[in-house]
């Protein structure tokens, strides 16, 4: 394919960035930057950088599995060293070991032997069994005195068990943990070891150390010859030695260095200076909204609040209001007053300061009435030491020469820190004094370092460089921005540099998984509220034709909140006439033309005549609030007695407001992610537009508003194309377009459409039937065809999915707009990022018995709390234990096949006399097992986990698929067997030199399969190893095609053609892959 070389285009690039997608659109603009035509658009989709169901890091599962493997390996090595020690000290002889180095005929009653060792001499084998058992099960060793105050529930349960057993040993009823286990655990609960999620049988390693010492003493008394000092020292070392936690320099190395002082390490968050910096940032940014104006705190107010967080454990907004003596009409900016008791939320909490103070109080080292008397420098040192070091020993080593022993002991008992900030203590100590004078953080940084972001790279290049991972720590955001960068650079390579870039990021970008779930929860609640409101509307208006629209429902909602009265006149509104055209109107209390505020908090229900009289004035101006007129007082009373939320009342009653500030806030999205990306692009990319501000972050609410006004229908559930729709709107949100809309709304508010009106600013004739300004004529029709390939995007039409069909459709439907058909028009094809990662989980976690693998069967031990009725039918020895089978079945059926509920209470077997006997916790279940991964020296088998690649071969006009798993990659195995339907792996087709290698497939590689019946073109989703069929994902994931956008069970062996394609990040360059040699797995 020849390289695409377009003519020079003056265009705006619009981006709609989500956590798993980037929609993009190019809109050409004229010299005044008015949108004039749609050049190109598309969607890039990728996997979010987290576990979808839990929000966990993708690395967490690997990290936990690696941790378990390390523990297992270290335990095995510890036991090996113990066996070697026993042989070296003469406890055991060479004849006692088998060919694998394991001890022959080792007694299997170690708990009983540990108790017996207190009263009699043990044989060498018995003594070996005891010592090995202590080394294998060596309890829990805490390295911090204050570990019991953890918020980790699992660790808390473990520590509770350790403490309880330590207390039981101190009573003197039991000499050792072994005696306690035999005489208490086994008798009371029937088992000695911990069970699932129960840590009540855990011992402290120090208690086990005491038992070891006592055992050596007793065995020496009984004449055991194998109690030498060397053996005791070696065993005790193996018992007590533990790898130190990552701390000190290792932690600092991982954290990196200061933004402003590159040679300095980042400061601990729980230092005095860092906490004061955080407080000063909040204090200096705090704004009061009062009588319509916004203001910062005065110097006196700042001084009043400055030391309050040190006096109170938590400083709330309500406390701040009282201290500042604010009037009831004053509010804190940024606080969500919609929720109950909003001002009860915390303004500032000095966690470290008060943690240190409480620790000293608990140990009687601080007078409750006096302030903390440790210097700021010493508190910084304490915060740093307790954040960097993870053991009492290391912390003591750092602080022993700085603070008194009794204070250090108190702190070790009660505090633990771990968080860090991005700035060093050195930088903070330079910045904080300026912030204490009232300067904002950015102002203080600019004064000291010259720039808020430290050393800034201002070199402009044609292409955007990589997003710095050290500045964007959230992996979900980093991947989204990195994919956006690929799209930007792809557009520039294809079309040249844009004049401007407009960006909208989805609300969830930059939010934690928990926050995103909260957003989803609120959206679901809002959806249910709308359904209830719609049902209520139909009750009030049973004769209403069709489904009520959001505007109809909003009228009823405002009617109820305003107690059925017009907010401007106070007159009663006739509910029966609510839907009568012109009778009532929804008005923007603060004129939209002056604020661009279309939020619910700016909407009121008024009689049509009152709305016309008000025009584009604020209520304060309309009712002559400046002179405190009677009308203004009555209006205030109506607002105050309404059921509006507090924040809405505040907005409606605004007396003064900054129009430019309102527009700036409502048109721009100032979240950190947007600010970062805008600044990053502006500083590093060469853009051709006029003026300084050439990168703009659009507000999502404005995008929704314009999309609705411009007649663009968006249904998220249908397919992935809708991301491009928003990108078009974002691109068209130019300053020139905003000005047009502002003028239109202003004239409409002023009821200026009386016949013909001349716009004095432009000379444009405005007619009474003038519609909302569009970017260009037939805008909605053109955009919907370009995005969905159908007239108005309606599903009943056939999609114009080829270049010729799309241009023909545009020419037919938009005959009056020939500009819609041009050389850059191409069908939208969603680009999906392929996953070519070759590593992954080696095998599934569950290991099954492989004794009957030759029968095609494996045996799995299934806990009763996970046993379903279908599993029960495959229970091993079902015929030999019919009573057990029937009892389990009855319990499950009684609880509707919910095993968690069915076996919440213990389940027991009963003898012939009906007496309760053994507790049943799990049963063995047969499973079909054709293949898998051998583990545990070929004694167990586990299911295959990740299929990372499928290699495609061809021979005699037939195609053969060879699946490759991550465990094969790890071992460097390149498989040579192709799937044969219904056959075991050993009977699969052997691939030799007579087969031709075609290509390798990874998830989301673009493929084409042509059969006698159909042509399928989409992204490879998966391969079924039992049938050799593949699943193909439709490019836009149209849920009306296949199963939720996926074509399943496509046979490729006898396909007429099977081809892999390459696609760029824009979905524009699609070409067949070139033939290559078969790649290795590593």
From Swiss-Prot:
- Sequence positions that bind Mg(2+) 1: 16, 504, 508
Please give the cofactor(s) recorded in the UniProt entry for this protein.
Mg(2+)
Annotated Mg(2+) 2 binding lies at 16, 508, 723
* Result, substituting residue 16 to A: Does not restore CRISPR interference during plasmid transformation to deletion mutant
Q: Which catalytic residues are annotated?
A: 16, 588
Q: What class of enzyme is it?
A: hydrolase
Q: Report the domain of life of the source organism.
A: Bacteria
Which NCBIfam families does the entry link to?
Answer: cas_Csn1
Family membership, please give it. Belongs to the CRISPR-associated protein Cas9 family. Subtype II-C subfamily.
| Oligomeric form and interacting partners | Monomer. Binds crRNA and tracrRNA.
This protein is called: CRISPR-associated endonuclease Cas9
Name the source organism.
Neisseria meningitidis serogroup C (strain 8013)
Q: Which gene underlies this protein?
A: cas9
């Amino acid at each position: 394919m020849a390289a695409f070389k377009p003519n020079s285009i003056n265009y705006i690039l619009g981006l709609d960035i989500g956590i798993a997608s980037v929609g993009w659109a190019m809109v050409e603009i004229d010299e005044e930057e008015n949108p004039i035509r749609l050049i190109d658009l598309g969607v890039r989709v990728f996997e979010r950088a987290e576990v979808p169901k839990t929000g966990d890091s993708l690395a967490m599962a690997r990290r936990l599995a690696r941790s378990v493997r390390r523990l297992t390996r270290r335990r095995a090595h510890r036991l090996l060293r113990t066996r070697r020690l026993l042989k070296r000290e003469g406890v055991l002889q060479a004849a006692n070991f088998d060919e694998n180095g394991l001890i022959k005929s080792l007694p299997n009653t170690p708990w009983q032997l540990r108790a017996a060792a207190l009263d009699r001499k043990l044989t060498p084998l018995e003594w070996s069994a005891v010592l090995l058992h202590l080394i294998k099960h060596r309890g829990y060793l805490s390295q911090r005195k204050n570990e019991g105050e953890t918020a980790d529930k699992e660790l808390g349960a473990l520590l509770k068990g350790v403490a309880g057993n330590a207390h039981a040993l101190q009573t003197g009823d039991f000499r050792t943990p072994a005696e306690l286990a035999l005489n208490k655990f086994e008798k009371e609960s029937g088992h000695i070891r911990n069970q699932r999620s129960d840590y009540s049988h855990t011992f402290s390693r120090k208690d086990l150390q005491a038992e070891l010492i006592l055992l050596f003493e007793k065995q020496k008394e009984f004449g055991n010859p194998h109690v030498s000092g060397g053996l005791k020292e070696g065993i005790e070392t193996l018992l007590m030695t533990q790898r130190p936690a990552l701390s000190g320099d290792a932690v600092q190395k991982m954290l990196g260095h200061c933004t402003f002082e590159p040679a300095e390490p980042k400061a601990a968050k729980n230092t005095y200076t860092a906490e004061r910096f955080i407080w000063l940032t909040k204090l200096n940014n705090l704004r009061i909204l009062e009588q319509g104006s916004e203001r910062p705190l005065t110097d006196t107010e700042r001084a009043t609040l400055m030391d309050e967080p040190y006096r109170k454990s938590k400083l709330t907004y309500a406390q701040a209001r009282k201290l500042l003596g604010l009037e009831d009409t004053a509010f804190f900016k940024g606080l969500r007053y919609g929720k109950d008791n909003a001002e009860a939320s915390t303004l500032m909490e000095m966690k470290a300061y008060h943690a240190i103070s409480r620790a000293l109080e608990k140990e009687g080292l601080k007078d409750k009435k006096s302030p903390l008397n440790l210097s700021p420098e010493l508190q910084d040192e304490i915060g740093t030491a307790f954040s960097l070091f993870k053991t009492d020993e290391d912390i003591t080593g750092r602080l022993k020469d700085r603070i008194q022993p009794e204070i250090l002991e108190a702190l070790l008992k009660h505090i633990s820190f771990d968080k860090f900030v991005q700035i060093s203590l050195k930088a903070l100590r330079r910045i904080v004094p300026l912030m204490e004078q009232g300067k904002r953080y950015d102002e203080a940084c600019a004064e000291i370092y010259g720039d808020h972001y430290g050393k800034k790279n201002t070199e402009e290049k044609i292409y955007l460089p990589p997003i710095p991972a050290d500045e964007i720590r959230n992996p979900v955001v980093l991947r989204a921005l990195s994919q956006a960068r690929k799209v930007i650079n792809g557009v520039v390579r294809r079309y040249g540099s844009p004049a401007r870039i407009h960006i909208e990021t989805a609300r969830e970008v930059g939010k934690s998984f928990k926050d995103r779930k909260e957003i989803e929860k609120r959206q679901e609640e809002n959806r249910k509220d709308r359904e209830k409101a719609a049902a209520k509307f139909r009750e009030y208006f049973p004769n209403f034709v069709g489904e009520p629209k959001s505007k109809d429902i909003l009228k009823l909602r405002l009617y109820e909140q305003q107690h059925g009265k017009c907010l401007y006149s106070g007159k009663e509104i006739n509910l029966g006439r609510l839907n009568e055209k012109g009778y009532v109107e929804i008005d923007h209390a603060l004129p939209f033309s002056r604020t661009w505020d279309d939020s619910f908090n700016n909407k009121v229900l008024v009689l049509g005549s009152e709305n016309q009289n008000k025009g584009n004035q604020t209520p304060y101006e309309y009712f002559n609030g400046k002179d405190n007129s009677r009308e203004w007082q009555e209006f205030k009373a109506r607002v105050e007695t309404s059921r509006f939320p507090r924040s809405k009342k505040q907005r409606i009653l605004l007396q003064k407001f900054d129009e430019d500030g309102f527009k700036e806030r409502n048109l721009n999205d100032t979240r950190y992610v947007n600010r970062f990306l805008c600044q990053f692009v502006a500083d590093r990319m060469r853009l051709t537009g006029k003026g300084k501000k050439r990168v703009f972050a659009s507000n999502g609410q404005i995008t929704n508003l314009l999309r609705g006004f411009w007649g663009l229908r968006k249904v998220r559930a249908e397919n992935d194309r809708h991301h491009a729709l928003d990108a078009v709107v974002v691109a068209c949100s130019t300053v020139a377009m905003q000005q047009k809309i502002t003028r239109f709304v202003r004239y409409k508010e002023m009821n200026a459409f009386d016949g013909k009106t001349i716009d004095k600013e432009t000379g444009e004739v405005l007619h009474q039937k003038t519609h909302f300004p569009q970017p260009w004529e037939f805008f909605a029709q053109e955009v919907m065809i370009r995005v969905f390939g159908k007239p108005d995007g309606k599903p009943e039409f056939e999609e114009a999915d080829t270049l010729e069909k799309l241009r023909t459709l545009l020419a037919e439907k938009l005959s009056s707009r020939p500009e819609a058909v041009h050389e850059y028009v191409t069908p939208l094809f969603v680009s999906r990022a392929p996953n070519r990662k070759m590593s992954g989980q080696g095998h599934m976690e569950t290991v099954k018995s492989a004794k009957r693998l030759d029968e095609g069967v494996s045996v799995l031990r299934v806990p009763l709390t996970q046993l379903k009725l279908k599993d029960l039918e495959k229970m091993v020895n079902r015929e030999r234990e019919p009573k057990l089978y029937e009892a389990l079945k009855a319990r499950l059926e009684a609880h509707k096949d919910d095993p968690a509920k069915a076996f919440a209470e213990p389940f027991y077997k009963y003898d012939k006399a009906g007496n309760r006997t053994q507790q049943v916790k799990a049963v063995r279940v047969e499973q079909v097992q054709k293949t898998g991964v051998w583990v545990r020296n070929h004694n167990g088998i586990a299911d295959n986990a990740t299929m990372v690649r499928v290699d495609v071969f061809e021979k005699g006009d037939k195609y053969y698929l060879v699946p490759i798993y991550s465990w094969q990659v790890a071992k460097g195995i390149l498989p040579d067997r192709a799937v044969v339907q219904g056959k075991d792996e050993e009977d699969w087709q052997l691939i030799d030199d007579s087969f031709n290698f075609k290509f390798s497939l990874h998830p989301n590689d673009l493929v084409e399969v042509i059969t006698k019946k159909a042509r399928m073109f989409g992204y490879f989703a998966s391969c079924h190893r039992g049938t050799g069929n593949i699943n193909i994902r439709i490019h836009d994931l149209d849920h009306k095609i296949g199963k939720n956008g996926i074509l399943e069970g496509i046979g490729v062996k006898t396909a007429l053609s099977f081809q892999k394609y390459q696609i760029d990040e824009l979905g524009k360059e699609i070409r067949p892959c070139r033939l290559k040699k078969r790649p290795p797995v590593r």
